[in-house]
Amino acid sequence: MKNLGDWIRQIRDFLETTFLQIDHWFEMNEPCRQHKPLNGGWSIDQILEHISLTNHFLLILIVKATKKSLEKKASSPNWQQEVANYSFQLEKLQQVGVHKSFYWMRPEHMEPKGDMTLVEVRLKLKEQLLQCLQVLDQLKDGEGALHKTTMTVNSLGKMDVYEYLYFLAQHGQRHLTQMENNRIEFENLSPD
């Protein structure tokens, strides 16, 4: 069984890997990135913008929960006992990363509008990764397990800061699959 420190390291690695994989898509040629799939879905550029928008709103929740976790640590001398038997919702959270594994109705404010340039989206994603890693640095001793916030997506229920960070990375993984599907369709439709 993993301890909390192992989970924190795994989450850090997963965040870094996911953001690196997402960043790769900015190097894709423009016609491929702008191709809208035949099913009416988003282009790769739109998906990248959506990832950054979703991260923005998730990070608002993560920062608030981080503050509450640190406040709880400061007011509870025995806080480590509260996280001693830590349990991470790995299986439920992994489903988030599987494209079309469940119905997901996103809020309108997370839909891409084309308000940011591709350069701005890429910069925003890099800043968001740094913000995620800073949160992990702030909560390096397990404090992130002290406060839980409800997540309604896929009936995940109450999640701590570490689970929210993992959710954020899994959301990116979900869209990596979608972008790859777009690329394959574009290549199949393109003349040789």
What function would you assign to each model-found segment?
Residues 1-16, 20:
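Extreme N-terminal tail/first-helix region
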Residues 1-2, 32, 105-113, 152-155:
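A short small-residue
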Residues 18, 84-143:
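Acidic/histidine-rich alpha-helical segments that form the ligand environment
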Residues 22-32, 99-105, 144-152:
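Short alpha-helical hairpin
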Residues 33-90, 127-192:
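Short, contiguous alpha-helical
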